[in-house]
Amino acid sequence: LRPALQGVRASPCPKGWLDFRGNCYGYFRHELPWRKAQAWCRALRDGCHLASIHSAEEHRAIARFVSQCQRGEEEENVWIGLRQLVKLWAWSDGSKMRYSAWDDDEFTKGNYCAALEDSSGFLSWEDDSCGERNAFICKYAA
């Protein structure tokens, strides 16, 4: 080993993915409706879903990652794994909702899904029609 590489651990995540606190996050710029984006994530590997976000720290790391990925492009909203089921919001990976960052408390009734809002630097969420086509972020446990 070269001295500069001692103590450096190889990332368990694929090249170009974010490695954060035991999870891998991949950004996909091709725009899909929410259900197709979720299917894309599920097809990547077992346990992969549209990203669930459970803390402000995790949210900031993802927002920085998405901003870097979209650098030089027109910023666009990005799907995360939250969607409205009847009156409740639920994560696509089945995890409990312990954190939220909605841009406001007014929700439209109907078939809505959550996206990181481009105009906030991806630091707030917006409810968007699930049929809208957005870029998306996938997550799996490393």
Swiss-Prot record:
Q: C-type lectin domain spans which residues?
A: 20-139
Subcellular localization(s) per the UniProt record: Secreted, Extracellular space, Extracellular matrix
Source taxon at top rank: Eukaryota
Q: List the disulfide bonds.
A: 13-24, 41-138, 113-130
Q: Which UniProt keywords apply?
A: Disulfide bond, Extracellular matrix, Lectin, Secreted
- Whether Disulfide bond counts among this entry's keywords is yes
Question: Disulfide bond: present as a keyword of the record?
Answer: yes
Q: Which PROSITE patterns match?
A: C_TYPE_LECTIN_1, C_TYPE_LECTIN_2
Extract one GO molecular function annotation from the record. Answer: carbohydrate binding
Please give the InterPro entries that the UniProt record associates with this protein.
C-type_lectin-like (IPR001304), C-type_lectin-like/link_sf (IPR016186), C-type_lectin/snaclec_domain (IPR050111), C-type_lectin_CS (IPR018378), CTDL_fold (IPR016187)
One Pfam family of this chain: Lectin_C
* GO CC terms in record: extracellular region
Looking up SUPFAM superfamilies in the UniProt record yields:
C-type lectin-like
Q: What is this protein called?
A: Dromaiocalcin-1
Organism source for this protein?
A: Dromaius novaehollandiae
Q: Please spell out the taxonomic lineage of the organism that makes this protein.
A: Eukaryota, Metazoa, Chordata, Craniata, Vertebrata
